[in-house]
């Protein structure tokens, strides 16, 4: 009987459909002990910087994340202990004062652009997914999301994409594809891939329930 919780890593470029794929997996197991943890929650606290300095941070670089803290909390969850996950304020560009209590689960989905870039994170994962989506689709989705959800201007989004997001994708994110167990072209619309992933998860959950 399997007792250790499983961790599923889901990565891909910004706007590529990582969150949609993760939520599709979550929705497929409504009665299971399953949760999603986002790498974005672990952006470093920048309260000591001015707002102008925070805006200039390269948020697509590994150094923008407190991955050490994420690994520490994932290890606690694997031991069956609850953790308080930080909440990031995208408009203020720093951590908020709030945290989210995450209880231990049988399945933990770890989602983010760089979750396969760090070897220590990869070593915690049982299944690693790379959501592979066309560049044009990703930038359109990013524009819509950042304007509607994060209160950003079109000019700032385009400038960030051309100077930071695109170069970082080719330097860090795309190369991490080689570590993926499964590559999911076109994200959540790839029903066959999602079904295969869900079948694998269901078999693991069955082992836990025995």
UniProtKB/Swiss-Prot annotation:
Q: In which pathway does it act?
A: Pyrimidine metabolism; CTP biosynthesis via salvage pathway; CTP from cytidine: step 1/3; Pyrimidine metabolism; UMP biosynthesis via salvage pathway; UMP from uridine: step 1/1
Mind telling me which InterPro entries this protein's record contains? P-loop_NTPase, PRK/URK, Uridine_kinase, Uridine_kinase-like
Question: Which Gene3D superfamilies does this one have?
Answer: P-loop containing nucleotide triphosphate hydrolases
Q: Which gene carries the instructions for this protein? A: udk
Q: Know the name of this protein?
A: Uridine kinase
Q: Which reaction does it catalyse?
A: uridine + ATP = UMP + ADP + H(+); cytidine + ATP = CMP + ADP + H(+)
In terms of Pfam families, this protein maps to: PRK (PF00485)
Q: Name one GO biological process term.
A: CTP salvage
Which annotated residues bind ATP?
Answer: 12-19
Where does it localize? Cytoplasm
Which Enzyme Commission number(s) are listed? 2.7.1.48
Q: Which GO terms describe its cellular component?
A: cytoplasm
Keywords assigned: ATP-binding, Cytoplasm, Kinase, Nucleotide-binding, Transferase
Q: Which family is annotated?
A: Belongs to the uridine kinase family.
């Amino acid at each position: 009987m399997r007792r250790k919780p499983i961790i599923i890593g889901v990565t891909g470029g910004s706007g590529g459909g990582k969150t949609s794929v993760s939520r599709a997996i979550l929705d497929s197991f409504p009665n299971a002990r399953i949760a999603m943890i986002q790498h974005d929650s672990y952006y470093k606290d920048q309260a000591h910087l001015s707002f102008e300095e925070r805006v200039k941070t390269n948020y697509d670089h590994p150094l923008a994340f407190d991955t050490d803290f994420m690994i520490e909390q994932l290890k606690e969850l694997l031991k069956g202990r609850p953790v308080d996950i930080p909440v990031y304020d995208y408009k203020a560009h720093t951590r908020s004062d709030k945290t989210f209590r995450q209880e231990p689960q049988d399945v933990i989905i770890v989602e983010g652009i760089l979750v396969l870039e760090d070897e220590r994170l990869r070593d915690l994962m049982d299944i690693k997914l790379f959501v592979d989506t066309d560049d044009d689709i990703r930038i359109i989705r990013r524009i819509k999301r950042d304007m509607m959800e994060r209160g950003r201007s079109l000019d700032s989004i385009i400038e960030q994409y051309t100077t930071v997001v695109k170069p970082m994708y080719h330097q860090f994110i795309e190369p991490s594809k080689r570590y993926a167990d499964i590559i999911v072209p076109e994200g959540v619309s790839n029903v066959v891939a999602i079904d295969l992933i869900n079948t694998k998860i269901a078999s693991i959950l069955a082992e836990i329930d025995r």
